[in-house]
């Protein structure tokens, strides 16, 4: 029987698996100040570096090939020590294969309960 989490308990991914909260990504169709363009992914990001809570805005170009769930539903992002290990250990449903949006970082998107979740591995930790 699956354990029901109480209101005062942290999610299992943090409490037991050791994942660390990194940011929340929110899709938008509005231009945001300080946008940075990621040409290989065809979208703009902003807000992350200024937000004390890790709020990141994402504005997608027409023709962006990322999964529509990523483009339309906010996602949580967690830092993990070994992205591929976590995916296989927990039998996670991958909706965007591991890729590198920048130097020293690998990300993948999974789906849980209809919502996208980003896993981030920083290669400097290796």
Q: What are the functions of these language-model segments?
A:
Residues 1-65, 91-126:
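Vicinal oxygen chelate
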Residues 69-97:
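Mid-chain, well-packed structural core segment of small domains
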């Amino acid at each position: 029987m699956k354990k029901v989490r109480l209101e005062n308990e942290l999610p299992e991914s943090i409490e037991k698996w050791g994942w660390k909260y990194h940011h929340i990504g929110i899709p938008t169709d509005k231009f945001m100040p300080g946008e940075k363009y990621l040409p290989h992914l065809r979208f703009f990001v902003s807000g992350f570096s200024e937000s004390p809570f890790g709020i990141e805005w994402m504005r997608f170009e027409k023709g962006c090939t990322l999964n529509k769930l990523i483009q339309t539903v906010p996602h949580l992002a967690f830092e993990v020590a070994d992205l591929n290990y976590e995916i296989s250990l927990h039998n996670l449903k991958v909706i965007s294969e591991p890729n590198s949006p920048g130097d020293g970082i690998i990300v993948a998107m999974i789906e849980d309960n209809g919502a996208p979740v980003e896993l981030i591995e920083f290669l400097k930790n290796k």
